C-alpha cells in the first residue's frame, strides 16, 4: 500500500502557502539533510519514488523560487530499489533557512521548525504528508497493520508525534535497533490520518482490504467453530454407540423392548442425530424420548454390571476409540 499512498499524495494539489511550506520542511527534514560542499551548504533529499522527487522539485521552485537537480541511483548492492537524489546547491543555505532546517543563527534544527510545531492543524497534516512521502510506509491491513515513518532522530520523531496529536491521532515514537520510528498501529487511527493528509482514494482501497480480511477471519473462525462442533458430535455419537453395544451384551434380551429398540437404532445409525433417530423409530419419537430411552437402557445395563461385578458400559469407551472418531 505504500506506493499507492505516495503516488496519490504526490499528485495532490495544495493551495495554502503555509501548508506547502510545512510539507516541504518535513519532506526535506525526513528525507535528507544538510551537507557542506566546497564551503557551501547543500540541501539534499533521498527519495524512493520519481513522483515524490518531481513534487519536491516543483514545490521548491514554485514556493521558494530555487532551482534543483535530480540524480537517479540504480538498484544494486545494498540498494534494493531505485533512489532519487534531489539537490539544491547554489541556494542551499537560503532554502535551509526558509524551510527551518537552519535557525536564525544558522544552526541546524534537530526536530521540525517552530512554525510547523506550533502551527495549525493544516500545518500538522502537511508535515505528516511530507514525512510520509520522505520515509513512510503502510502495511496491508491485518492483525499487525501499521503506518510508520522512519525519523532522522528522536527530536523529529517527537515533533511528528505531537503533530499527530493535534490531528486527534495517537502515534508513538519507538527506537527500533537504533533507528527512530513513529508508528501508528490502530486501524481507525491509520484511516483518520490518511484522511487528514489527503490520501482519500488510498484510504478507500485500504478499508476495502481491511473489510475483506475481517470477513475472511470471521468466516475462518466460524468454520473452525463448526469443525470443532462436528468433532465433538462425532465423538459423542461413537461413545454412545459403544456404550449401547456394551449394554446390549450385558442385558441380552432381558430389557424392555422399547429400550432395546432405541438401542438398536443407535447402533444401526451410528452417525445420526437424536432427532434423526426419532424420525426412524416406529412410531416416530421426539429426540428427547429417544435420548431418555437410551439413557434408561444404559442405566439398567450399568446396574446389572455392578451387580455381576463386570465392567460397566463406560468401560467400553476407550481413548483410542474417541481418537479415531
Swiss-Prot record:
Signal peptide: none
Keywords attached to this entry: Cell cycle, Cell division, DNA-binding
Chain residues forming the annotated DNA-binding region: 273-306
Molecular function terms from GO: DNA binding
Kinase as UniProt keyword: no
Listed InterPro entries: Homing_endonucl (IPR027434), Sporu_reg_WhiA_N_dom (IPR018478), Sporulation_regulator_WhiA (IPR003802), Sporulation_regulator_WhiA_C (IPR023054), WhiA_LAGLIDADG_dom (IPR039518)
Keyword Cell wall biogenesis/degradation appears in the UniProt entry: no
Domain of life, per lineage: Bacteria
One Gene Ontology biological process: regulation of sporulation
Family the UniProt entry places it in: Belongs to the WhiA family.
NCBIfam families for this protein: DNA_bind_WhiA (TIGR00647)
Purpose of the protein: Involved in cell division and chromosome segregation.
Name of the molecule in the record: Probable cell division protein WhiA
Naturally occurring in which organism (per UniProt): Frankia casuarinae (strain DSM 45818 / CECT 9043 / HFP020203 / CcI3)
Organismal lineage: Bacteria, Bacillati, Actinomycetota, Actinomycetes, Frankiales
Amino acid at each position: 500500500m505504500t506506493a499507492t499512498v505516495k503516488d496519490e499524495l504526490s499528485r495532490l494539489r495544495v493551495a495554502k502557502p503555509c501548508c506547502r511550506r510545512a510539507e516541504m520542511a518535513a519532506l526535506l527534514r525526513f528525507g535528507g539533510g544538510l551537507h557542506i560542499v566546497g564551503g557551501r551548504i547543500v540541501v539534499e533529499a533521498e527519495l524512493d519514488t520519481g513522483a515524490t522527487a518531481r513534487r519536491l522539485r516543483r514545490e521548491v521552485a514554485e514556493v521558494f523560487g530555487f532551482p534543483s537537480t535530480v540524480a537517479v541511483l540504480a538498484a544494486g548492492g545494498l540498494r534494493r530499489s531505485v533512489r532519487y537524489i534531489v539537490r539544491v546547491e547554489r541556494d542551499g543555505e537560503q532554502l535551509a533557512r526558509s524551510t527551518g532546517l537552519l535557525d536564525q543563527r544558522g544552526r541546524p534544527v534537530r526536530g521540525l521548525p517552530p512554525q510547523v510545531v506550533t502551527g495549525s492543524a493544516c500545518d500538522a497534516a502537511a508535515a505528516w504528508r511530507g514525512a510520509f512521502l520522505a520515509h513512510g510506509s503502510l502495511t496491508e491491513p491485518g492483525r499487525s497493520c501499521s503506518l510508520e515513518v522512519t525519523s532522522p532522530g528522536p527530536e523529529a520523531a517527537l515533533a511528528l508525534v505531537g503533530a499527530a496529536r493535534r490531528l486527534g491521532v495517537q502515534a508513538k515514537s519507538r527506537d527500533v535497533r537504533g533507528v527512530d520510528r513513529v508508528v501508528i498501529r490502530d486501524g481507525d487511527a491509520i484511516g483518520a490520518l490518511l484522511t487528514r493528509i489527503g490520501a482519500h482514494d488510498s484510504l478507500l482501497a485500504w478499508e476495502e482490504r481491511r473489510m475483506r480480511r475481517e470477513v475472511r477471519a470471521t468466516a475462518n473462525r466460524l468454520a473452525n467453530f463448526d469443525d470443532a462442533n462436528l468433532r465433538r458430535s462425532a465423538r459423542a455419537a461413537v461413545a454412545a454407540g459403544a456404550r449401547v453395544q456394551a449394554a446390549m451384551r450385558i442385558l441380552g434380551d432381558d430389557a424392555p423392548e422399547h429400550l432395546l429398540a432405541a438401542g438398536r437404532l443407535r447402533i444401526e445409525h451410528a452417525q445420526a442425530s437424536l432427532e434423526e433417530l426419532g424420525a426412524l423409530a416406529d412410531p416416530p419419537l421426539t429426540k428427547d424420548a429417544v435420548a431418555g430411552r437410551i439413557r434408561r437402557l444404559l442405566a439398567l445395563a450399568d446396574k446389572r454390571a455392578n451387580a455381576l461385578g463386570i465392567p460397566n458400559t463406560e468401560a467400553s469407551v476407550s481413548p483410542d476409540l474417541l481418537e479415531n472418531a
